[in-house]
């Protein structure tokens, strides 16, 4: 993908976000971000109890980079059927490279807000699942 295509993809995801909206039956609702990182998101996760994700969505607001990147990572999870451990293993640097480091510039925190919040939601879900409880929603 060249630079122009990467910019168009990011803008498309920011203006037409995928999987955006709360999950009513989520096991986890994980807030992330703040003013210092380009926006805020809440990631909603429903797990199957066996390391797989039944459903994943997000809500939030921010700049084109933070909202576009959040939409891209959630769509990637859906499209590729990634398991929880696979998501936790995703490399932030590789994710930023895929978005286009030249586009992101110094706004790495904006670009990784969605991914870091998805990872935090998974860790909370796994802790609750190991202890036999339910994650805080």
What are these regions (language model features)?
Residues 3, 7, 34-36, 66:
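Hydrophobic alpha-helical segments and helix-packing faces
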Residues 69-80:
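Short, internal acidic amphipathic alpha-helical interface segments
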Residues 45, 54-56, 73:
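Helix-adjacent hinge/juxtasegments
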Residues 34, 39-49:
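Short beta-strand elements
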Residues 1-24, 29-30, 48, 75, ...:
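C-terminal binding/interaction regions
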Residues 36-37, 60-70:
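Short, thiol/selenol-centered motifs that function as redox-active sites or metal-ligating centers
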Residues 25-28, 55-59:
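Flexible, solvent-exposed loop/hinge segments and secondary-structure transition points
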Residues 57-65, 79, 106:
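Short alpha-helix boundary/capping segments
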